[in-house]
Regions:
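Repetitive helical segments and hydrophobic/amphipathic motifs
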Residues: 11-12
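Extracytosolic ligand-binding ectodomains
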Residues: 2-8, 17-405
């Protein structure tokens, strides 16, 4: 088994080098059936080995889960990943420009693949001839972050993408980084931190800005459904801070939530603005229950968390006819979409992939290759990328922007 996998990996590296040097990606988007999105399907160790044995390397990378994988699979994942981003060894051997990607994969889970894959897709899109290395550090413990950044700096990686949560950023900000090291963090917003470090850039979309935009479409009778997660709690707080003080909050933190006791003959829900700070599944459940109990809300409002085509398959058209969503993704590059599809992720709906691409686009064109052209036009405001917010509505079997924006 081990010998066959090594042979497969060697043949893959040779194939990839040919691809990087000779082939041009088609600007035509692939069909959904050819590059299916398998994000919600579990792939155990046997499944991962099967993907390797059949040569489905991109699928292996996109579905790898470090929590369940054995040591051999972890080693193969790391080697295969660094084989993919080692685009041209002859050029990279003498390259003075380097990019490091630091990932606490046990902490950010599936976001690990999203950040790495979208980075690879962007560099392929730009035909980048730079040295890239991925550092998998497990968790965001201060000692591990210190070790990773020391190693990256010792190896002369001056440009770093770090997939950190709030905890990781707080530990990072304690570090004494070289003055020429620049760090981009796509996963969090600068608003959450008291820092003036000019070499640390933040890339999260602005949920607070989205809430403020959504409330422009409210009639003031605000009712919040929340699922009790850290993100939902932050969204709830944003609504309360921007609202009129009359908001009510209902938290759905279990599958046994009693909708009947809340919705049945509850006149306060009629003609109300219902704000859904809930996951896709719970949003679909709430919207169907609202219709079941003959409630006619003024509007349903939700942020980026529910801007996903999966919502269309989870809900009936009548369930979402009054639903408005905030969206900060604005990708028009079809080749970049295609390359992300190779990794079974959709940059047009995955904000982590989009934010990673936006930040890397800025780093690459401003610092790594100043002769290249930017793909995105998001600007910087005090080292935080600034995203526009568009309001989207469901129309039939798809999404469409409101016309009066």
């Amino acid at each position: 088994m081990r010998k066959s996998l090594v042979c497969l990996m060697m043949s893959f590296v040779l194939t990839l080098n040919v691809f990087a040097k000779e082939q041009k990606p088609s600007p035509i988007e692939p069909s959904e059936s050819f590059y299916p999105n398998l994000e919600f399907q579990n792939c155990d160790n046997d499944c991962l080995f099967t993907l390797l044995e059949t040569g489905l390397y991109f699928n292996f990378l996109s579905r790898f889960n470090n929590d369940n994988a054995n040591e051999l699979l972890v080693n193969i994942y790391t080697k295969l990943l660094n084989s993919i981003i080692d685009f041209e060894k002859r050029i990279q051997k003498n390259a003075s420009i380097k990019l490091a990607i630091i990932i606490p994969e046990q902490t950010i889970k599936s976001y690990s693949n999203t950040i790495i894959n979208s980075s690879i897709a962007y560099l392929l899109r730009q035909r980048a001839q730079i040295k890239v290395k991925v550092f998998l550090i497990g968790t965001e413990d201060e000692s591990k972050i210190t070790k990773a950044f020391k190693q990256a700096q010792d190896e002369k990686f001056n440009y770093i993408v770090a997939g950190f949560t709030d905890k990781g950023v707080k530990n990072l900000l304690k570090e004494s980084l070289d003055s020429n090291v620049k760090v981009f963090i796509p996963t969090v917003h600068k608003r959450n931190f008291d820092t003036q470090n000019e070499n640390v850039y933040f890339g999260s979309i602005d949920y607070q800005k989205q809430i403020q935009k959504l409330l422009e479409y409210s009639n003031g009778k605000n009712i919040i459904f929340s699922d009790g997660t850290a993100l939902a709690n932050r969204l709830d707080e944003n609504v309360l801070n921007a609202g009129n003080g009359s908001e009510k909050i209902y938290t759905i933190n279990s599958s046994k939530f009693d909708f009947r006791s809340i919705l049945n003959q509850n006149r306060s829900f009629q003609d109300s603005s219902i704000i859904l700070n809930t996951s896709l599944i719970k949003t679909a459940l709430i919207s169907s229950q609202i219709r079941t109990y003959d409630i006619e809300p003024f509007v349903l409002l939700s942020t980026q968390i529910n801007y996903n085509p999966i919502l269309l398959s989870l809900t009936q058209i009548n369930d979402r006819k009054k639903l408005l969503l905030a969206n900060s993704i604005s990708n028009e590059d079809q080749t970049l979409s295609y390359l992300n599809e190779l990794f079974s992720q959709n940059i047009n709906y995955n904000w982590i992939a989009y934010a990673t691409s936006v930040g890397l686009d800025y780093f690459y064109t401003q610092f790594l290759d100043k002769d290249s052209q930017r793909i995105f036009d998001e600007g910087l405001n005090d080292n935080q990328f600034d995203y526009k917010v568009k309001i989207i509505r469901s129309q039939g079997l798809g999404f469409t922007p409101l016309q009066d924006q």
